[in-house]
Amino acid sequence: RSLRVGVIGAGMAGILAVIKLREAGITDIVCFEKADRVGGTWRENTYPGIGCDVPSHVYSYSFAPNPDFTRMFSPGHEIQAYLERVAVDHGVVPHLRLGDEVVSAIYDRGVWHLETARGHRADFDVVIAASGVLHHPRMPEIDGVDEFEGAMFHSARWDQDVPIDGRRVGVIGTGSTAVQITGALADRVEHFSLFQRTPQWIMPMDNKLFSDDQRATFRSEPHRLRELRDFLESAFAENFADAVVDAKSVRLEQIE
């Protein structure tokens, strides 16, 4: 009997899991996705300014380079389109069960028993959890928030029907999402307020465009794209190592 594998979630990790299982010769795979399409984080989040803070050609599968990314740091809709295309090109789609959220997973005598919100039941030898953590919005507990009469929503549930231009807008928090929203809205609104508990240290993003000629070169000479990816990965790894310093070091004192 072939190995039966259930994958929960069809975001970047879930898509990759199905692809690698197929490469290993496993074909009895079901990938459960609660939404109506793949994409995970990039499907769920549609707020103004959404983008990746990792270089486009690093934030992609090594076996599926994308010569058509338009910027060094991709906007969210380009990553979503990329993931949808990879799912088609690499045979993931036939294994998808969209709109079917897993609500129960019980392990008994060597078998996983899964049940979905639609009442479907299935048994698996192996279950891979790829549901992620960025699709459960957490609203802050603020006294009096229920009395606020204006539009209010979490960034992960952006209400596209609410007009923003020329309005008074407040954003709570200064994490990555808030920084992106601030940059996208500051010049569009009448008044913008950013409420933060702890100030961030922020530097400009050098988000240059890839020209038509560059993208054409990436398509016709794939090794050029691999070279760029390798360079970016190496540079980011080195920069990350440089950024992590001992709390008692002289260098940290210099930075501060």
Language-model-detected regions and their locations in the chain:
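Feature captures the FAD/FMN-dependent oxidoreductase FAD-binding
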Residues: 71-135
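Short, flexible, glycine/charge-rich loop motifs used to bind or transfer phosphoryl groups or to couple energy/partner
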Residues: 49, 93, 104-105, 117-119, ...
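General N-terminal targeting signals
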Residues: 55, 59, 64, 69, ...
